[in-house]
Amino acid sequence: MSHNFHVIIPARYHSSRFPGKLLQEINGITVIERVYRQALLAEPMSVIIATDHDEIADRAIQFGAEVVITSHTHQTGTDRIAEVVAKGSFAPDDVIVNVQGDEPFIRPQLIQQVACSLTKTKAPVSTLCWPISSLQILNNPNVVKVVRTRDNHALYFSRSAIPFHRDDKNAYSNTFRHIGLYAYRAAFLLEFVSWPPCTLEQIECLEQLRILWSGFSIRVEEACEEPLQDINTKEDLILAQQYFLDTFNV
């Protein structure tokens, strides 16, 4: 049974930290194919891979994916999926889930959760978070933190430690890391990418701040399951390969 949302996977070849990572293999299957398979398990109405790279497109077609060739000038994955929406026949209220192309073990339940979350709110965007489990994670600028209202809407996203524990600098209770999985209404996605970057976004290098800056809400639910590591470096790939061996006893 399919659910009433669509998944688009932005698939960029020229990653700054690990070019070609989506074509690397985990037990004989490329990263991008594993992401695609996990997205299918969420039972969306469609799964589309958006890429500007011929080899990624060819591989995706070989394993049966629908592929849309996009511009090579996009600065973000959000811009890339917006091009797919603009080219397609999506209705304004269709739910579009942006699944990153470097998450080979993304849990289908999280994809379903973020899509369902959007249907429970007037906010045009939804995303997820997870409790921070150490001071090291809290103070890591590569881990994006989020603070929320009592009804689960984002107050702010930052690379800094937020909220700041004034009386105990070693505390990390009530802190959450952002999970980079988004659901958008199709019409809002197209509107969002038409806006110029805002000052906060440029300072933090976090494009979701453009939404808050512009006066719109982002719903942020705590994930129903802990997310697994994405692949940003060669070291991450080695860990992912070992995770597969350990989990499936290959």
Curated annotation (Swiss-Prot):
Pathway: Nucleotide-sugar biosynthesis; CMP-3-deoxy-D-manno-octulosonate biosynthesis; CMP-3-deoxy-D-manno-octulosonate from 3-deoxy-D-manno-octulosonate and CTP: step 1/1; Bacterial outer membrane biogenesis; lipopolysaccharide biosynthesis. It is an enzyme of class 2 (transferase). GO terms for molecular function: 3-deoxy-manno-octulosonate cytidylyltransferase activity. The keyword Cell division does not apply. InterPro entries: Cytidylyl_trans, KdsB, Nucleotide-diphossugar_trans. GO terms for cellular component: cytosol. GO terms for biological process: CMP-keto-3-deoxy-D-manno-octulosonic acid biosynthetic process; lipopolysaccharide biosynthetic process. It is found in: Cytoplasm. It catalyses: 3-deoxy-alpha-D-manno-oct-2-ulosonate + CTP = CMP-3-deoxy-beta-D-manno-octulosonate + diphosphate. Keywords: Cytoplasm, Lipopolysaccharide biosynthesis, Nucleotidyltransferase, Transferase. Its EC number is 2.7.7.38. Activates KDO (a required 8-carbon sugar) for incorporation into bacterial lipopolysaccharide in Gram-negative bacteria. Belongs to the KdsB family. This is 3-deoxy-manno-octulosonate cytidylyltransferase. It comes from Legionella pneumophila (strain Lens). The lineage of its organism: Bacteria, Pseudomonadati, Pseudomonadota, Gammaproteobacteria, Legionellales. The gene is kdsB.
